[in-house]
Swiss-Prot record:
It comes from the Eukaryota. The active site is at 330. It is found in: Secreted. This zinc hemorrhagic metalloproteinase has fibrino(geno)lytic activities. It causes hemorrhage and has myonecrotic activity on both fiber types I and II. The recombinant enzyme, without post-translational modifications, also has proteolytic activity, but does not show any hemorrhagic activity. Disulfide bonds join 304-384, 344-368, 346-351. It holds the Pfam family Reprolysin. This is Snake venom metalloproteinase ACLH. Monomer. Its EC number is 3.4.24.-.
Length: 407
């Protein structure tokens, strides 16, 4: 008994290495078991909320102690954020849950100026962070010890499919000449634009996740949490206006032909979704395997158009941020961005608007994307992204459980 107790204490105090494990993110060849310790100070006598606005965790990565600083992503949800699903007889059910006390965070690693983090703290810590130039994933382990987490490098996750994955947008536009060079675009937060996004989840996704709507919503929330961080450097603020789950059946003809699905989705958005939810852009998340290597498709330079401010994204990976980057890529097309060429750069990393998803996880938009996005905004002046949406943390929200049933 004493020997068992000593072993347990040692495991709780020190991380240990594992050679191979199957996690939610996939098969991992090399991982580290860690026990993140929350060190956020709480004033004496104060009641500690479930999710603070700011938190700090100590953990060990590669045997070295690090401090993870997290701040709640307060602008993640729009004021009138809604969730819609469908009953077995096809009735539309819409709720307006209170989301100001949510569990999604951005952050950084202490003493690493180039570090970033996008973390869900809903059930343990789950997400990704960049440390000393390398991307790491963290997720809770399903052990009797609920504090145990796995930390592993992105490169140590076995690839689900070695075939290249691409965006279906082709370079068939007219010759493009930007109005300014990057050095001439001296933008600041006075130029900020605001995109309110609705993510629609098809019936195949509902089946793929075994009808677990909460798990689907958490998947989408974490995706948008990552997208918001990527767009922050572009002076584009992303907020989630709604999640709609086609829990009964698909409301459009979802096909492996991505262009057909995109056209169908855009038409449905114009005649249906826009009349129910105020938003600027809609993205369809589907379990359908698109033809060929395509994992996403969107119209170019169409933000604010009733039909064309849309994209379709295949749920192509168990790693959340890879699907999030794909959705950020497709929305980038809506904002006028083209695919990066060899002359484009984003600080030595793989860029979000690369036409091919590389093994080096994309993190940033390139200098080309920056110019193209703001060239589109300055020339076309899309009106719907000018207004700053009210945030859920600054206004009252409908009472939990408010529900609308529609025939």
């Amino acid at each position: 008994m004493i020997q068992v107790l000593l072993v347990t204490l040692c495991l709780a105090a020190f991380p240990y290495q594992g050679s191979s494990i199957i996690l939610e993110s996939g098969n991992v060849n090399d991982y580290e078991v860690v026990y993140p310790r929350k060190v956020t100070p709480v004033p004496k006598g104060a009641v500690q909320p479930k999710y603070e606005d700011a938190m700090q965790y100590e953990l060990k990565v590669n045997g070295e102690p690090v401090v993870l600083h997290l701040e709640r992503n307060k602008g993640l949800f729009s004021k009138d954020y809604s969730e819609t699903h469908y009953s077995p007889d096809g009735r539309k059910i819409t709720t307006y849950p209170p989301v100001e006390d949510h569990c999604y965070y951005h952050g950084r690693i202490q003493n690493d100026a180039d570090s970033i983090a996008s973390i869900s703290a809903c059930n343990g810590l789950k997400g990704h962070f960049k440390l000393q130039g390398e991307m790491y994933l963290i997720e809770p382990l399903e052990l009797s010890d609920s504090e145990a987490h796995a930390v592993f490098k992105y490169e140590n996750v076995e690839k689900e499919d070695e075939a290249p994955k691409i965006c279906g947008v082709t370079q068939n536009w007219e010759s493009y000449e930007p109005i300014k060079k990057a050095s001439q675009l001296n933008l600041n937060y006075q130029y900020q634009r605001y995109v309110e996004l609705v993510t629609v989840v098809d019936h195949g996704m509902y089946t793929k996740y075994n009808g677990d709507s909460d798990k689907i919503r958490q998947w989408v929330h974490q995706m948008v949490n990552t997208m918001k961080e990527s767009y922050r450097y572009m002076y584009i603020d992303i907020s989630l206006a709604g999640v709609e789950i086609w829990s009964n059946k698909d409301l459009i003809d979802v096909q492996p032909a991505a262009r057909h699905t995109l056209d169908s989705f855009g038409e449905w958005r114009e005649r249906d979704l826009l009349h129910r939810i105020s938003h600027d852009n809609a993205q369809l998340l589907t379990s359908t395997d698109f033809d060929g290597p395509t994992i996403g498709l969107a119209y170019v330079g169409t933000m604010c158009d009733p039909k064309l401010s849309t994209g379709v994204v295949e749920d192509h990976s168990k790693i959340n941020f890879l699907v999030a980057v794909t959705m950020a890529h497709e929305m980038g097309h809506n904002l006028g961005m083209r695919h990066d060429t060899g002359s484009c750069s984003c600080g030595g990393y793989s860029c979000i608007m690369s036409p091919v998803i590389s093994d080096d996880s994309p993190k940033y938009f390139s200098n080309c994307s920056y110019i193209q996005c703001w060239d589109f905004i300055m020339k076309e002046n899309p009106q719907c992204i000018l207004n700053k949406p009210l945030r859920t943390d600054t206004v009252s929200t409908p009472v939990s459980g408010d529900e609308l049933l529609e025939a």
